[in-house]
Structure formats: structure tokens, C-alpha cells
């Protein structure tokens, strides 16, 4: 049996690029949620409004890898760097509580 994975991706936009970053991330929501292996894909804003945060859940590491090879992901990767004050902080998580799997 394959284990699900979750991803937390944190984005610190340049002050002049916040709207562009938001649009780029918004454009990822519908195609990513349509992927077979995607369980959830939600965009948040930190309480202080500084960061944008994606919380993603996939059925397996294979599903995450397939997402990272998709045309919409590759398009996002080609554009995101110029919109940030620092690189995206990505954490991949494995469940400890089997009920969350």
C-alpha cells in the first residue's frame, strides 16, 4: 500500500508582485484539483498577510511526482522565482496518524 503525502509550500512575495503571485497560484488550483492523485489543494494567507501558503494532499508520492511533471506545474515553476523575495519553502510530510491516511 502506498502512503499519502502532504505538502506545505510557503511563498513570500515581492511587494510589487503580490497580485501576480496570487494570480499564478490561483491558476494552479483547478487543474491540480482535477489530477487523479490530488486529495486537496488549498491556498491560504498567513494571519499577518505576509505569506501565501499552499496546503496540498496527494494519494501517494507517485501522485506528487506526477503533479510536479504536469504542464501547469512546469509553467508555474518557470514564473514563480521572479515574484518572490526568497525561494519557496517546501515541506513534504508523511502521516503518522493512519486515520488521516
UniProtKB/Swiss-Prot annotation:
<keyword id="KW-0503">Monooxygenase</keyword>
<keyword id="KW-0560">Oxidoreductase</keyword>
<dbReference type="InterPro" id="IPR050744">
    <property type="entry name" value="AI-2_Isomerase_LsrG"/>
</dbReference>
<dbReference type="Pfam" id="PF03992">
    <property type="entry name" value="ABM"/>
</dbReference>
<dbReference type="InterPro" id="IPR011008">
    <property type="entry name" value="Dimeric_a/b-barrel"/>
</dbReference>
<dbReference type="GO" id="GO:0004497">
    <property type="term" value="F:monooxygenase activity"/>
</dbReference>
<dbReference type="GO" id="GO:0003824">
    <property type="term" value="F:catalytic activity"/>
</dbReference>
<feature type="domain" description="ABM">
    <location>
        <begin position="5"/>
        <end position="93"/>
    </location>
</feature>
<comment type="function">
    <text>Putative monooygenase that might be involved in antibiotic biosynthesis, or may act as reactive oxygen species scavenger that could help in evading host defenses.</text>
</comment>
<protein>
    <recommendedName>
        <fullName>Putative monooxygenase Rv0793</fullName>
        <ecNumber>1.-.-.-</ecNumber>
    </recommendedName>
</protein>
<dbReference type="InterPro" id="IPR007138">
    <property type="entry name" value="ABM_dom"/>
</dbReference>
<comment type="subunit">
    <text>Homodimer.</text>
</comment>
Amino acid at each position: 500500500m502506498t502512503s499519502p503525502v502532504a505538502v506545505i509550500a510557503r511563498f513570500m512575495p515581492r511587494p510589487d508582485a503580490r497580485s501576480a503571485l496570487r494570480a499564478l497560484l490561483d491558476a494552479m488550483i483547478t487543474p491540480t484539483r482535477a489530477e487523479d492523485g490530488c486529495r486537496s489543494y488549498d491556498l491560504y494567507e498567513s494571519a499577518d498577510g505576509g505569506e501565501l501558503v499552499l496546503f496540498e494532499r496527494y494519494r501517494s508520492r507517485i501522485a506528487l511526482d506526477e503533479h510536479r511533471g504536469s504542464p501547469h506545474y512546469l509553467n508555474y515553476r518557470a514564473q514563480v522565482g521572479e515574484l518572490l523575495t526568497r525561494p519557496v519553502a517546501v515541506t513534504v510530510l508523511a502521516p503518522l496518524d493512519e486515520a488521516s491516511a
